[in-house]
Swiss-Prot record:
The lineage of its organism: Bacteria, Pseudomonadati, Bacteroidota, Bacteroidia, Bacteroidales. The gene is rplK. This is Large ribosomal subunit protein uL11. One of its GO terms (biological process) is translation. Forms part of the ribosomal stalk which helps the ribosome interact with GTP-bound translation factors. GO terms for cellular component: cytosolic large ribosomal subunit. Gene3D superfamilies: Ribosomal protein L11, C-terminal domain, Ribosomal protein L11/L12, N-terminal domain.
Length: 147
């Protein structure tokens, strides 16, 4: 028989660096989840992505057990890594901070496709390009899908 789901918690944690301090401890402790057990499992699962911010969805059950799913890093974080910047533009319509190519956009879109609400790489590329524009990052050239 399936366990009864009590709820879900969504967090963004650096890979391989989960510890009981905030924000992880209070979020899990208030639901009665074993914090140290989650930290050990999360750190073991994300050793290869150490230092990257990773969204995680924790599903906890009535018997205080839990499961979690680690997703790919947010598009904004991947764009900042691609441009080697620390943050986006405060005025994205006026002050552009960097440029990226459609090849870089495609690489990010292919990586993120499993987590996005779309089915094709082209639509994922449009989503990534929109995020880039809202951060003050210019995408060089024309969209490769336009012939």
């Amino acid at each position: 028989m399936a366990k009864e789901v009590a709820g879900q918690i969504k967090l963004q944690i650096k890979g391989g660096a989960a510890n009981p301090s905030p924000p992880v401890g209070p979020a899990l402790g208030s639901k009665g989840i074993n914090i140290m057990e989650f930290c050990k499992q999360f750190n073991a699962k994300t050793q290869d992505k150490a230092g990257k911010i990773l969204p995680v969805v924790i599903t906890y059950y009535a018997d205080k057990s839990f499961d979690f799913v680690v997703k790919t890093p947010p598009v904004a974080i991947q764009l900042l890594e691609a441009t080697k910047k620390k943050s986006g533009s405060a005025q994205p319509n006026r002050a552009k901070i960097a440029e990226i190519t459609w090849d870089q956009v495609k690489a990010i879109a292919e990586d993120k496709l499993v987590d996005l609400n779309c089915f094709t790489v082209e639509s994922a590329m449009r989503m990534v390009a929109g995020t880039a524009r809202s951060m003050g990052i210019t995408v060089k050239g024309t969209f490769p899908g336009n012939n």
